[in-house]
């Protein structure tokens, strides 16, 4: 069972040649795996759906190349450990090809990194993106960065996204207003669930 997989505690898995791998979907689903794999070549991977869902993985994978990726659906859902190894480098991910980010950080209670730089212009589904997250585990500062960053990325219109009960502040109000604003007035018509201001 993958639930106990941790490569026998050896970091040697970091040396795997992954340059031709196309899918890493479900790879460490519900696994106790937590080895450094930040050096993996993910440049051809198109699917990372549920890759670390329900796992205890918490390593820095901020240098991964996601440029060919289209699915990060539930990638870290129910992973209560993941915070990119404490590094904000995940903000540098090229997610410009991703179309489905539904449940990506749902119930991911440790994740608290900025992702406002992500190019989310091709995402068509954000359903339950950060459902059940709170200000105890995601900062208003980082939510402000999402609102102010993503509102400049020309995202798809009419999307629904859930940030649990995370609050934003006046610093994020302008960005949120653009995302939720009417498409007739230059907004994107999003329906956003958050904890208010």
Language-model regions, residue ranges each:
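Negatively charged
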Residues: 1-197
């Amino acid at each position: 069972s993958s639930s106990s997989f941790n490569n026998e505690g050896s970091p040697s898995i970091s040396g795997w040649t992954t340059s031709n791998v196309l899918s890493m979907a479900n790879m460490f689903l519900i696994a106790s795996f937590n080895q450094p794999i930040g050096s993996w070549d993910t440049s051809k991977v198109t699917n990372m759906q549920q890759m670390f869902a329900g796992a205890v993985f918490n390593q820095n994978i901020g240098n991964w190349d996601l440029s060919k990726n289209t699915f990060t659906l539930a990638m870290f859902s129910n992973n209560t450990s993941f915070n990119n190894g404490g590094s904000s480098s995940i903000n540098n991910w090229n997610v410009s090809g991703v179309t489905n980010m539904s449940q990506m950080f749902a119930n991911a209670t440790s994740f608290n990194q900025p992702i406002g730089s992500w190019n989310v212009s091709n995402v068509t589904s954000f359903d339950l993106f950060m459902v059940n997250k709170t200000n105890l585990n995601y900062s208003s500062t980082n939510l402000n960065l999402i609102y102010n960053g993503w509102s400049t990325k020309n995202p798809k219109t009419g999307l629904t996204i859930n940030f649990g009960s995370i609050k934003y502040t006046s610093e994020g109000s302008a960005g949120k207003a653009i995302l939720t604003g009417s498409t007739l007035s230059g907004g994107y018509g999003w329906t956003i669930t958050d904890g208010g201001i």
